[in-house]
């Protein structure tokens, strides 16, 4: 009887310890990332050079993320600080879908996101919807316009690691817009994700984004100095590599190149000044 009592007590301690461990907020991963975006006609190195540190956490069926970052405009002759960035994420996970919230703050705006994603058999989808509250003045000295934005995959299909999704990028500007500036934009794309190689440590994948249609509206198009993407006017291709250093640590490198055709809003003539875009991303991630 005494042995049984001791065994039950030991099981009780183990169960309590396990429950406490599962119930505690824990760190799941940490990482750092550099992203360099460069457009033809811009800075020699990158108009947007981003460096960020991220921490992932989990609590029961919730996951959280915290990102602190800095962004610069980098030329061979000069480095200009552009903005800092703070991002807070929270996700509630269910059987085959999840719902979340994101707050993102930079020097010139704050964003408030509602997020969702689902995955069921061969089908999947996701949506990031946000309100962007801007600060500062526009070109005419008026307060900058807030915007409603959305990046949505209404539906996608997947099979053996290959994913194909219909993507919608939507923007609606709140309030009156200065002459020549965009009031709204809806861009439809097809996006393909596919594995290329998988070894013991090295994995190679690709991502292809192809624009189908662009439907936008400008206030007084005839005076606009902006340019827009033509229908079927851009294709971006990423080559992505991930190397598993050990069970916990991986490093990655990605490069994207965008082929584009743009036209001036006012007269429909081709914009040859911005026909190139490159995106270089590299970083590391450590899982606990």
Name each model-derived stretch:
Residues 33-39, 67-73, 102-106, 128-136, ...:
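Outer-membrane beta-barrel pore domains and translocons
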Residues 61-66, 93-99, 121-129, 158-168, ...:
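Repeated loop/turn-to-beta-strand initiation elements of outer-membrane beta-barrel proteins
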Residues 20-77:
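Short glycine/proline- and aromatic-enriched beta-strand/turn motifs that initiate or cap beta-hairpins
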Residues 69-183:
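Outer-membrane pore/translocation modules
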Residues 39-41, 137-144, 174-181, 220-228, ...:
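Extracellular loop and loop/strand-boundary signature of outer-membrane beta-barrel proteins
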Residues 272-288:
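Outer-membrane beta-barrel "beta-signal"
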Residues 99, 191-271:
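Outer membrane beta-barrel transmembrane domains
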